[in-house]
Regions:
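Solvent-exposed, non-transmembrane regions of integral membrane proteins
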Residues: 19-837
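Cysteine-centered motifs
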Residues: 11-12
């Protein structure tokens, strides 16, 4: 028996030589060890040179040369790993597990960071390049800042060192051979090299996943620089000057990390079948939290630089941002998430190393902070409430609160493991419930902050600057309420909470106030969110118009706020107003609906005429299912979503999109073969209380009632909604009756699961695949009786109104950060020239 991950080694035609002729793996391991030693030497010599004795330049020179050796070593080792991937060196475990002969060149290159060891190596390379830039631009801060960066770099390199000290393993090498990784596998011990690899995960074979990790890791790597400046400021007692050189790095870090997060969201939207771009997955959140804290830190740094306030907040948040980067790495790579997240890596035994890294960074950063806290400058007066610095500071605190809410929800797997020995996640409703009101406050402050002046404003001036944005925002919000489906959706939600939702919201019967809030509260908050988004849009738009005519590089803040406001409007439109195309499918207190379509069948759903016309193949050779659409205006188009079972036994369902400016049509399918159907199988729709004859007049199936008390063994921690269907199956000839209770489950990431029931004595299997709450009907997939066409699809189709605003908003947000990076870099260069003069 081969260990897990080594299946498929039977097709082999090469025998390992006692010593590999190329020795690439040995060279790669050696380069990593040399880089680690160089990192230690660089850190020690930079630490020594920061003492300002007569040998400063000599020690600094050694530190620079050592960092140069580290950089060359990491780049060379990364290049060797790419070479092994491209040349199909399947004797190496990393190459075997992440590549195959069928992969094109771009995916072979991307495989270099698809696995855990390779992504660590990519991060190390980014850190090395960041260090080179710091040595060039940090000036008098170079030595202490580089000492901190070197410490972090050494921790990272130990993750891929591949050493064994006694019984303690230190890291997992990307250059480990199959023999080294699976020493007990008999076929490997026989010296057999596989002729092909397991290949890259099919979900990762996407253009956006080729560029997403390098950008994300450049953000992670850049986050170390402001952290190092903050530690240096506390270490050297330079509590004020550190902000100017650190601010461009902070802005670049949140820019890169934000773009990386956005690309990941776009990948999820066009690749996964849950119909969205953010599922509040713990690993997604673990990147979001340091980004939010990083943005909050940027705002407090600006306040400190401009007004002399917020020294403590700027230092604390800057330190916290990087510690959360390390914490996100711990969540992703320690194995603590297990199967909770689709993004988590396989556990490589790095738990203790990652925990030590977090503790070291926390002790270094927060230890110095609390040690020096009483020495930090105190402002001579508190900022006026009606001032820009107060609004920016308050906005940073609200953003921090949002991040802490997400952090709390993200950390529940750790708390579950500590207190229940059972990691679990919180439902999506937790994040929405707490983040929505906080986002409303933050957006309102984002509008106020740019309109207010520094220092004090009087009430008359405030009224003057707020009048136009408030009037325009009010008009726009009223238009949204009356001219879009917003009012209809709010009414539908209230009706559901008042009728169909009684079983799900029984607590509301005991308090009329809670009843009213449960019916109208969420959409009222969403309407307020729309208002403050328009307010921030118009307020910052007015500021940007005035600034851009004079000096465009000063418009970064306004552009970022405009982008965030537009993005929020896009989120509200595409999520709150998402329109499921289909009313004969599943709607369980959720916007998710689906319907079943047989080959050649035509249905009319929400004004769309939809025909399942056949099968096809896309440009990458993947199987597609062809759906012919005629929209309500008579326009014809074809959708070709992908669905197939990968060689890893995983079903891949890539949606197809029809994109317009004002909406997207999103379609994903689950083919009948997913449910194990054969020729003696099919599907029916049946209403509560009705019965249907199935098979060749052999059985009667009756839908008795819904079952809202589903056995907990079927649920799991990620269950959002679970509904069972109590069925009575009667054998017509004998009169014998059996009970069945298949279950329909919606997970917290909006994916759907089906708990099938099988009657082994009759060899009949039933799956509950969808439902319509309004009509009380359900969809059943039945196997074991001849009853329906064998080729059918479960179709998930949605209109996503104005989802383009999400992407347009993030582009504006990123452009604003880019303008700010440019502005602060120019300011730093000018200040450096003045100092030199």
């Amino acid at each position: 028996m081969l260990p897990r991950g080594v299946a498929g080694l039977s097709c082999c035609n090469q025998i390992l030589e006692p010593i590999h002729p190329v020795m690439i793996g040995t060279i790669g391991k050696l380069l990593i060890l040399i880089s680690m030693v160089a990192g230690i030497l660089s850190g020690l010599t930079f630490l020594r040179s920061s003492r300002l004795d007569d040998r400063v330049l000599e020690w600094k020179r050694i530190g620079r040369y050592s960092w140069g050796v580290l950089t060359v070593g990491t780049l060379a080792s990364f290049g060797l790993l790419m070479y092994l991937n491209v040349t199909h060196a399947f004797e190496y475990a990393y190459v075997y597990e992440n590549t195959s002969l069928a992969l094109p060149l771009d995916y072979l290159v991307a495989a270099s960071w698809a696995g855990q060891e390779g992504s660590f190596l990519l991060w190390i390379v980014m850190n090395s390049l960041v260090g080179v830039a710091v040595m060039k631009f940090a000036r008098e801060y170079e030595s202490p800042v580089m000492a901190v960066i070197a410490l972090c770099q050494v921790f990272l390199i130990t993750m891929i060192a591949g050493l064994q000290i006694g019984s303690i393993p230190i890291g997992a090498s990307p250059f480990a051979t199959l023999v080294e990784k699976f020493p007990t596998a008999p076929m490997i011990q026989a010296g057999i090299i596989p002729t092909d690899g397991q290949g890259l995960n099919d979900l990762l074979q996407n253009y956006w996943m080729v560029i997403h990790p390098p950008i994300l890791f450049s953000g992670f790597a850049s986050m170390i620089v402001p952290f190092a400046f903050a530690v240096t400021a506390l270490w050297k007692r330079r509590y004020t000057e550190w902000v100017r050189p650190a601010l461009p790095w902070s802005l670049f870090a949140v820019l890169a990390l934000g773009v990386g997060i956005a690309l990941g969201g776009y990948w999820a939207y066009i690749t996964l079948n849950f119909g969205g771009y953010w599922a509040w997955d713990p690993v997604e959140n673990s990147s979001l939290v340091p980004w939010l804290i990083g943005i909050a830190a940027v705002h407090t740094m600006i306040v400190q630089k401009r007004s002399g306030h917020s020294h403590k907040a700027a230092l604390f948040l800057t330190i916290l941002a990087y510690i959360l980067v390390v914490y996100s790495t711990f969540l992703t790579r320690s194995g603590i998430l297990g199967d909770i997240s689709v993004h988590s890596f396989v556990d490589l035994g790095l738990y203790n190393q990652l925990l030590l890294w977090i503790l070291t960074m926390a002790i270094l950063g927060f230890g110095l902070f609390f040690l020096r806290m009483n020495e930090l400058p105190k402002p001579t007066h508190e900022p006026e409430v009606l001032s820009r610095e107060f609004m920016i500071f308050l906005g940073a605190m609200i953003l921090t609160a949002v991040a802490l809410v997400v952090l709390l929800g993200t950390s529940t797997p750790i708390m579950g493991r500590l207190f229940r020995d059972s990691p679990s996640t919180v439902p999506i409703a937790f994040y929405n419930k707490w983040s929505l009101p906080l986002t409303i406050i933050f957006l309102f402050l984002a509008g106020l902050g740019q309109l207010f002046w520094w220092n004090k404003m009087n009430v008359e001036t405030v009224n003057k600057v707020l009048f136009r944005p408030i009037v325009l925002a009010s008009i726009s919000t009223i238009a949204v309420f009356f001219l879009t489906p917003f009012r209809l959706r709010a009414a539908e939600a209230a009706a559901f909470a008042d009728t169909g939702g009684d079983a799900l919201n029984q607590a509301g019967m005991f308090a009329s106030l809670m009843d009213t809030w449960s019916q109208h509260g969420p959409y009222l908050l969403m309407l307020i969110l729309v208002f403050v988004a328009f307010f921030a849009l118009y307020g910052n738009g007015e500021v940007m118009w005035k600034i851009a005519r004079g000096n465009l590089r000063l418009a970064g803040g306004a552009a970022s706020h405009i982008g965030f406001a537009v993005m929020v409007l896009g989120i509200v439109a595409s999520s709150g107003l998402s329109n499921p195309i289909g009313r004969n499918g599943a709607q369980i207190g959720d916007s998710r609906e689906n319907f079943i379509l047989a080959l050649g069948e035509t249905r009319v759903e929400q004004g769309y005429q939809i025909t399942y016309s056949g099968h096809g193949v896309d440009e990458e050779g993947l199987p597609t299912y062809l759906l012919d659409f005629v929209d309500p205006n008579g326009h014809e188009f074809e959708m070709a979503p992908v669905a197939y079972e990968s060689n890893r036994g995983q079903w891949i369902q890539n949606p197809d999109l029809k994109t317009y400016f004002d909406k997207d049509i999103f379609v994903a399918v689950s083919p009948s073969v997913m449910f194990g159907t054969q020729n003696d199988s099919g599907q029916i729709t049946i209403a509560r209380g009705d019965s249907s004859i199935v098979g060749d007049n052999e059985y009667i199936i009756e839908f008795v009632e819904f079952d809202l008390e589903v056995d907990e063994e079927f649920l799991g921690d990620s269950t959002e909604v679970a509904v069972g269907a109590n069925l009575r199956l009667t054998h017509i000839a004998s009169g014998e009756t059996r009970q069945m209770s298949p279950v329909y489950i919606i997970r917290s990431d909006r994916s759907v699961d089906y708990v099938q029931n099988t009657l082994t004595e009759w060899d009949i299997t039933v799956a509950f695949t969808g439902m319509n709450v309004d009509s009380g009907s359900i969809n059943l997939a039945i196997q074991g009786v001849a009853m329906a066409p064998e080729d059918w699809l479960v179709v998930q189709a949605y209109e996503k109104p104005f989802i383009s605003l999400v992407w347009i908003g993030f582009i504006f947000l990123s452009l604003g950060f880019a303008l700010s990076v440019y502005r602060r870099s120019v300011d730093l260069r000018i200040a450096g020239k003045r100092t030199a003069a």
